[in-house]
Amino acid sequence: MKVFILALLALTATTAIAQLETTCSQGFRQYQQQQQPGQRQLLEQMRPCVAFLQQQCRPLRMPFLQTQVEQLSSCQIVQYQCCQQLAQIPEQIRCHAIHNVVEAIMQQQSQQQRQERQQQAQHKSMRMLLENLSLMCNIYVPIQCQQQQQLGQQQQQQLQEQLTPCATFLQHQCSPVTVPFPQIPVDQPTSCQNVQHQCCRQLSQIPEQFRCQAIHNVAEAIRQQQPQQQWQGMYQPQQPAQLESIRMSLQALRSMCSIYIPVQCPAPTAYNIPMVATYTGGAC
């Protein structure tokens, strides 16, 4: 019975990962065919990273038997996708891409969550997530971005969409999956790990000279999803809260993906980034 259950769990996880990779690969084909990736294409690649940083995973359920036990969580799938997409983003623009992921996450936070004590706790937890991001994806991401050339709006949007899984992961929005087995609790990966893998893969495919700005764009897009009144005095890129969120994002993606990102990149003063769509774990 135990062998049957383990085999069934492995088959379920393999099928879910294969479906997510097939869906994501279709959206990234256009970027891979170009020598110089467009901003829209890069942002599309970063969509799993945004989802991973935000951890907006949804639970999966298997309707058989009657006893539910915690098994696969969609967050590990998102984590796998995040690392996968982050690795595909060229090293030159990973830093900016991660920056934008964090800024977009901060934009989505409620006004109550922006209180001083809660903000300090969020920065601490975000810093830990960023540090784990590089280790998790086995891809290098520097803490700060170097000066990079400005990207076009289409290129910025592409980078932002590529990092969607990473944003989902960093925002702790994963939901556990329950599988109804009779009294057999099993600890299994979550879909966020799969999105994490995609995030790292996409980030590694972004040219090195564009990675810093790409991460910046993702963080900015997440930030813009919150009401403007929640961000009074924080819209300028030089604000400490914004800079801190970018720094923590770079640390996480660098550790999780083990991918190179320049130490410092210019502030996105000329950026005009559309909002990132919320990643639900079922699509990129």
UniProtKB/Swiss-Prot annotation:
InterPro entries: Bifun_inhib/LTP/seed_sf, Bifunc_inhib/LTP/seed_store, Glia_glutenin. Residues 1-18 form the signal peptide. GO terms for molecular function: nutrient reservoir activity. CDD domains: AAI_SS. SMART domains: AAI (SM00499). Belongs to the prolamin family. The keyword Disulfide bond applies. The keyword Lipid metabolism does not apply. Keywords: Disulfide bond, Seed storage protein, Signal, Storage protein. SUPFAM superfamilies: Bifunctional inhibitor/lipid-transfer protein/seed storage 2S albumin. Coiled coil: none annotated. This is Avenin-like b4. Pfam families: Gliadin. Seed storage protein. Might be integrated via inter-chain disulfide bonds within the glutenin polymer. Contains disulfide bonds. PANTHER family: AVENIN-LIKE B5, PROLAMIN PPROL 14P.
